[in-house]
A protein has these predicted regions:
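Generic protein-terminus/edge-of-domain signal
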Residues: 1-65, 80, 103-110
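A general structural signal marking secondary-structure boundaries and capping sites
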Residues: 11, 25-28, 48, 70, ...
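Residues that scaffold the ATP/ADP-binding catalytic core of kinase and kinase-like folds
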Residues: 52, 98-100, 204, 216
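Ligand-binding loop in jelly-roll beta-barrel domains
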Residues: 57, 71-95
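Amphipathic alpha-helical segments enriched in hydrophobic/aromatic residues interleaved with Lys/Arg
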Residues: 98-164, 175
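N-terminal positioning helix adjacent to the helix-turn-helix/winged-helix DNA-binding module
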Residues: 115-118, 165-173, 209, 218-221
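Basic/polar phosphate-binding segments, predominantly the helix-turn-helix DNA-binding elements
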Residues: 151, 176-178, 183-221
């Protein structure tokens, strides 16, 4: 377990500044009924957990990440106690809510398979810089911006290309449809074989194929 909360002073005039960073090993059950006062980026290093926000539950697995704006109630917890490790940072800045929204982070964002070596590398640079009481604040400010931009790029790339999990999920479903289109195929069957809920399957399928699963099936016939 390692965390740092820098003493906030002159860095408050910067557009981005670090208000806290750490590695939770293990991560515990956290309930924030009123959210945080800072912006938050949080990724899973190992183990598994769940995030609950806005009435929905999101799986937190290695490579997954979420962004949370200030003031949003949320909860997260490990699936197995003492076996979940996360890397988190919280940051602030004047007009940051508008800036984050302009970059596509509107309140809450989540995705799987977005954490890459660049993101983890910058995170550990920030963790090191945050320990420097003399020059760490400005260095961290630059790294926070670089970190956000790399996270944004990873989120956009995952959305564009679907992420490996979405690709493999659709590949299984499409192969099944092509082999069995002559018989009755249900949405429940496609979702079950893909290992996801009907709602998630439909959303990913429509995002990638630009049509609903049953519409695609009808066209194959």
């Amino acid at each position: 377990m390692e965390w740092i909360y820098p003493i906030l002073g002159k860095q408050k005039c910067l557009p981005f500044y670090l208000s806290g960073i750490g590695i939770a090993e293990p991560e515990y059950h956290v309930i924030r009924e009123e959210g945080l006062v800072s912006h938050q980026l949080h990724y899973t290093q190992s183990g598994r957990g769940n995030l609950v926000v806005g009435g929905a539950t999101y799986p937190l697995e290695p490579g997954s990440m979420f962004y949370m704006a200030p003031g949003i109630p949320h909860e997260y917890y490990p699936l197995v106690e003492d076996e979940w490790t996360t890397c988190w940072l919280v940051f602030r800045g004047e007009h940051l809510l508008e800036l984050m929204k302009g970059m596509g982070f509107d309140g809450f964002a989540y995705d799987k398979n977005v954490v890459n070596e660049k993101i983890t590398g910058i995170f550990h640079q920030m963790l090191k810089a945050a320990k420097d009481p003399l020059y760490g604040d400005e260095r961290c400010s630059m790294l926070v911006y670089e970190y956000i931009m790399n996270v944004r790029q990873a989120f956009l790339a995952n959305k564009k290309y679907g992420g490996q999990s979405a690709k493999s999920m659709l590949q299984r479903a499409l192969m099944f449809i092509h082999k069995n289109y002559a018989r009755d195929i249900t949405l429940e069957e496609l979702a079950e074989m893909s290992g996801v809920t009907k709602q998630h399957f439909c959303r990913v399928f429509k995002e990638q194929m630009r049509m609903r699963p049953m519409e695609y099936l009808a066209r194959q016939r």
